[in-house]
Amino acid sequence: MEHQTSRRNFLKIAGSSAAVAGAGLVSGNANAAPAKVNVGASTLPYPITAVGKAKGLKVDAPVSFNYPDASSPCVAIKMGQPTPGGVGPNNDIVAHSILCTHMGCPVSYDASAKTFKCPCHFSVFDPDNHGQMVCGQATENLPQIQLSYNAANDTFTAIGVTGLIYGRQSNIL
């Protein structure tokens, strides 16, 4: 007497067998000690780049510069109120990459709303809150350029980047 298995029953049996075999592989290492990994602090060699003088900035008037290299457009903005990550006499100067984290379109600063807006897919970012993504297609915050302020000569410089600039595997090429 021949026993025929339907296609549906065959798939049920094969799927169950694969699940049991997979569970055995996963649980086989459950009691093993985790491998020790030496995670040292790595610092990317960001350049120190002069951006401008604090007194030369006007509130809500972006100043363009490139950082960390010539193919990375950025803007510095005097927000007019103390801002997280801000530098200067009033801690109100921030800088961000202007490449949208969704598809790399250049964002523009809207002074009336105090936001960066992407014209391609309508993402909106908040420079008052570390470039946080407010709405739109982007899933990451706008990269913030880390600034340093020298009160003696009223200059601020770019010293690093928080976040990944669009289209890169590393901010330093």
From Swiss-Prot:
- Name of the gene: aioB
Q: Which cysteines are joined by disulfide bonds?
A: C105-C120
In terms of SUPFAM superfamilies, this protein maps to: ISP domain
- Please give the family membership noted in the entry: Belongs to the AOX family.
Cofactor(s) for this UniProt protein? [2Fe-2S] cluster
The species this protein belongs to is Herminiimonas arsenicoxydans
Query: Which Gene3D superfamilies does the record associate with it?
Result: Rieske [2Fe-2S] iron-sulphur domain
For binding [2Fe-2S] cluster, which residues are annotated in this chain's numbering? C100, H102, C118, H121
List the catalytic activities from the record: 2 oxidized [azurin] + arsenite + H2O = 2 reduced [azurin] + arsenate + 3 H(+)
Q: Where does the record place the Rieske domain?
A: 60-156
**Taxonomy of the source species:** Bacteria, Pseudomonadati, Pseudomonadota, Betaproteobacteria, Burkholderiales
Q: The organism sits in which domain of life?
A: Bacteria
> According to its UniProt entry, what is the function of this protein?
Involved in the detoxification of arsenic. Oxidizes As(III)O3(3-) (arsenite) to the somewhat less toxic As(V)O4(3-) (arsenate).
Q: Which UniProt keywords apply?
A: 2Fe-2S, Disulfide bond, Iron, Iron-sulfur, Metal-binding, Oxidoreductase, Signal
> Signal sequence: where?
1-35
Provide the protein name.
Arsenite oxidase subunit AioB
Q: How does it assemble?
A: Heterodimer consisting of a large and a small subunit.
Q: How is it modified after translation?
A: Predicted to be exported by the Tat system. The position of the signal peptide cleavage has not been experimentally proven.
PANTHER family named in the record: CYTOCHROME B-C1 COMPLEX SUBUNIT RIESKE, MITOCHONDRIAL
Transcription regulation among keywords: no
Q: How is the cofactor bound?
A: Binds 1 [2Fe-2S] cluster per subunit.
